[in-house]
């Protein structure tokens, strides 16, 4: 499969702020089916200074148009993607009833994850913890959307339009680019990167919630 990391996304996209676990959150990780209003619980994340070169690179990563349909090198790789899409759609059905909305969401998660060099199961687990898959979730400190992007990211590397963070692809683009940024800062240490994302760097609670939720979205293709 060919995937251009610089490929366009949504022009309104901006980098993502770190997350706050949703109140219904990760209790869904451990099997509790809480369903609360569009409020998410924030971690004590801090806005960090960015070097000009880093800010420029992050801004370039988010400033694209809608993602193209993926192009696969082989029929088998395309079939593998479609099998993944079908399985994830089945798992997500209880949370997102509308088929078209569900498939569009999963296609975008897959694209943005791969574009940022992340595993889709990790991103889905993070979304489960951050917002419980609620598009309009808002934390007590103002983090927004599926991946609980902090508004300051729109100012730092986007066009400043914080309402755009409720746009599905914009939010997912920001979230994936920001998590990738934290992974790079932490030299690939996912535990520490997740802590940065939540504003609780070095503490185990949030990373462990995401690791637990990720298991709900792990996918093993069927044996040939």
Annotate each predicted stretch with a short phrase.
Residues 1-10:
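N-terminal Lys/Arg-rich, disordered targeting/topogenic segments
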Residues 44, 64-224:
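Catalytic glycan-binding domains that act on GlcNAc-containing polysaccharides
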Residues 42-51:
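Cleaved targeting-peptide boundary
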Residues 36-42:
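Sec/Tat signal peptide C-region and signal peptidase I cleavage site
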Residues 10-31:
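N-terminal secretory signal peptides and thylakoid transit peptides that target proteins
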Residues 59-63:
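Conserved catalytic or metal-liganding residues and their short signature motifs at active sites
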